[in-house]
């Protein structure tokens, strides 16, 4: 099933990132650039680095100049994330281009790639919650609460994986059809962001 392929690659990316556990480490994609595996690995690596950017920027003692630079990195990462999701949707559009929708076929609330995006973020939540359950410096109460949260996340993974696979099955059978809207990110576009527009003139 596609969800298992995706999740396994996300987990591989997360584990590899945490060997060095450094947002500045070089990115090396082990998968051929012409494959969906390549896109999935890249997607999760972007998410994993951004997860840790978000940790760093919440440091109460962070230097304001460093925080500003980091905020710009987060903005760039968000754009990269969105672009990668759209590449993944392009893969699905190509996969199902010859499918004729059935009469009465319906549209989903989100495209397959945005469900993949949520699965990638969920993998990160599961990894870090699992780390919390293994802390030796935490109270028993903290460990117990995190174990409960981990069980909820694992159930969410099961449900989301099933929903994603069912969506892809429905698209392949013509019961649903894909309709993709390019995300209109406004904050990085000087034509749409009034502050950037002011500086551009």
Regions found by a protein language model. Give the residues of each.
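Anionic, Ser/Thr-rich low-complexity intrinsically disordered regions
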Residues: 1-201
